[in-house]
Swiss-Prot record:
Catalytic activity line of the entry: (S)-2,3,4,5-tetrahydrodipicolinate + acetyl-CoA + H2O = L-2-acetamido-6-oxoheptanedioate + CoA
Keywords linked to the UniProt accession: Acyltransferase, Amino-acid biosynthesis, Diaminopimelate biosynthesis, Lysine biosynthesis, Repeat, Transferase
Protein name: 2,3,4,5-tetrahydropyridine-2,6-dicarboxylate N-acetyltransferase
Keyword RNA-binding: no
Source organism phylogeny: Bacteria, Bacillati, Bacillota, Clostridia, Eubacteriales
EC number from the UniProt entry: 2.3.1.89
Length: 236
């Protein structure tokens, strides 16, 4: 079944109809040499095993063989999850530990995603863009090339509340720490959003906005460019 993931209602339907998953990993001290483990991934022998699979299948193996198990420890990080994480091995970018990136996200060459950042389904990150620590990009949020999304900043998604138009951030935009870009807002290339701003309306190219709600306070000049320049070495 195909879904139009540019539409918030289609994204919601995709999530609703996706097979929910509760994967677990279990370390077992015991004799599982005769256990039926065809439907899971497992490693080990001689009294020690690692089991990986859906929680209901693992639970059945543990219960069926409890008389042969001395100890076990279970690890679990999600419950009835609808969307898997992005396969980072296919990404030509720097992704730091602790970033949470859902499947069906596009990340450009030499982009950087820092610790604690969260990027939801359908988001697009341009070449050379940095998503700083604890920043959030909602479903279908679009960031252009060489953008800096500051620590703790939020780019709203198209899901709750549903919005046909995603947030769109142009190229070479700097968004300061803890700023919020509301649903459907477009920010023109080369603009700067001051830290802590709440942007509720579209921003033209080449301006500086600040405040809540954010207002244009000046044009981007050489002094502003000097204060907001990006470092290429961080993207190598």
């Amino acid at each position: 079944m195909s879904y139009n993931l540019t539409d918030p209602y289609e994204i919601a339907r995709f999530i609703k109809e996706s097979k929910k998953s509760t994967p677990v990993k279990v370390y077992v001290n015991g004799d599982l040499s005769k256990a039926l483990m065809d439907d899971i991934e497992w490693y080990g022998a001689n009294g020690f095993y690692i089991l990986i699979g859906e929680s209901d299948l693992i639970a059945k193996i543990i219960l069926d063989n409890k008389h042969l198990i001395k100890h076990f420890r279970l690890e679990n990080d999600r419950r009835n999850s609808a969307i898997p994480m992005l396969d980072l091995l296919e990404v030509d970018a720097r992704i730091e530990p602790g970033a949470i990136i859902r499947d069906k996200v596009t990340i450009g060459k030499n982009a950087v995603v820092m610790m604690g950042a969260v990027i939801n389904i359908g988001a697009e990150i341009g070449d050379g863009t940095m998503v700083d620590m604890n920043a959030v990009i909602g479903a279908r949020g679009k960031l252009g090339k060489n953008v800096h999304l500051g620590a703790g900043a939020v780019v709203a998604g198209v899901l709750e509340p549903p919005s046909k138009e995603p947030c769109t951030i142009g190229d070479n935009v700097l968004i300061g720490a803890n700023s919020v870009i509301l649903e459907g807002v477009r920010i023109g290339s080369g603009s700067v959003v001051a830290a802590g701003s709440v942007v509720a309306e579209d921003v033209p190219e080449g301006v500086v906005v600040a405040g809540s709600p954010a207002k244009i306070i000046k044009l981007v000049d050489d002094k502003t460019k000097g204060k907001t320049q990006l470092l290429d070495d961080l993207r190598k």
